[in-house]
Amino acid sequence: MPNLEELWAYLNDKFREELTPVGYSTWIQTAKPVKLTKDKLEIEVPASLHKAYWEKNLVTKVVEGVYEFAQLEVDPVIMTKDELQPAPATDQRPAVEEDDQNLTFKAKTHLNPKYTFDRFVIGKGNQMAHAAALAVAEAPGTTYNPLFIYGGVGLGKTHLMQAIGNLVLDNNPAANIKYVTSENFANDFINSIQTKQQEQFRQEYRNVDLLLVDDIQFFGDKEATQEEFFHTFNTLYENMKQIVLTSDRLPNEIPKLQERLVSRFNKGLSVDVTPPDLETRIAILRNKADAEDLSIPDDTLSYIAGQIESNVRDLEGALVRVQAFSTMKNEDITTSLAADALKALKLDDRSGQLTIPQILNAVAKYFQLTVQDLKGKKRVKQIVIPRQIAMYLAREMTDNSLPKIGQEIGGKDHTTVIHAHEKIMASMTTDENLKAQVIELRNILKNRG
């Protein structure tokens, strides 16, 4: 059994890397581990909103992290401080047993039962992805195979993917479903080689009815893993078994992804999810508030929705901050109170986010050029290389899509951005001067302000 403190420190490090500073401080630093047994990890959180957020967004990552750290499969149980207080057994025991049943994962699949189509808020930015996911769930293996869902972090890709798994399982409880991240797949593959159990690994992944692989972009620099996944994909596809993949970008935009995998991924349907518009953000907040029995006026929800444009996770984090602020001050939630509660969040979320114009200004100043030079079409070396560096930095240091980067740097095509990124990456391995310039610019941008 692993040491609980060491395990929690490992999980904290993972969350610190994956979440925004605001998200980390809101969700992770306010939680603490209570007890670890051979099949359960109890985690205490401050309030019901935190609990709901953990159950929806974080428990999957806990399961993965515990397995990575200790090769132990556990079901996270998220409880508020009040729920952890001792009480008469006759009153509390049945409720706790019901909570355990409702909150834990379906052990066989690692699917979060809260990720369902009913709980998914549909908007302009995700309606096509939602429709495609529902079609796949209702008739797996017959249409849109594979289904490739792509987009930025916190926009609902994992929710849709797991909703497919949950609906398939509801319709057919005997279905063999495998949900993993690309990192899980790679780790399982490596372990199978080390333990000489490759055949067992292949049986586990190739005899499923539905394979769900999250964050497929991390296959990019893993040649042997790509080889293994190629054969796994072919076996499932030929047997008309459904494959669903998610990524932060299109298949042909994933660096170092084999062309034959790009071709396989493009066989089905690729659909994107984009940041929710204002109406959708308001609907998400109303849905969340109703689920938590929070009394919040419509104008206050509209105000909160207007402050957070990035993704659903940050949006829900903002609602939690407002609710906590209301509790602390013992005041009803109003627009004025929400504005006070979100002051720090607004500063972190907007001021701290690097933009493409900031990158262009820094690169232009560094190379003694103008921003217009970088956006222009001149092909002289003194401008081309800084322009490529700007594209490289925009790709590495922001969450903007390739088309967005190209558009803001003079209306270039997204393939130009890909070429620039690859060119600078390759040049940095042989040109020490260029490498030093890129590192210096990175530091300038990180320490801006």
Swiss-Prot record:
GO terms for biological process: DNA replication initiation; regulation of DNA replication. The keyword Nucleotide-binding applies. It comes from the Bacteria. Residues 110-326 are annotated as: Domain III, AAA+ region. SMART domains: AAA, Bac_DnaA_C. Belongs to the DnaA family. ATP binds at residues 154, 156-158. The lineage of its organism: Bacteria, Bacillati, Bacillota, Bacilli, Lactobacillales. Plays an essential role in the initiation and regulation of chromosomal replication. ATP-DnaA binds to the origin of replication (oriC) to initiate formation of the DNA replication initiation complex once per cell cycle. Binds the DnaA box (a 9 base pair repeat at the origin) and separates the double-stranded (ds)DNA. Forms a right-handed helical filament on oriC DNA; dsDNA binds to the exterior of the filament while single-stranded (ss)DNA is stabiized in the filament's interior. Residues 327-449 are annotated as: Domain IV, binds dsDNA. This is Chromosomal replication initiator protein DnaA. Domain I is involved in oligomerization and binding regulators, domain II is flexibile and of varying length in different bacteria, domain III forms the AAA+ region, while domain IV binds dsDNA.
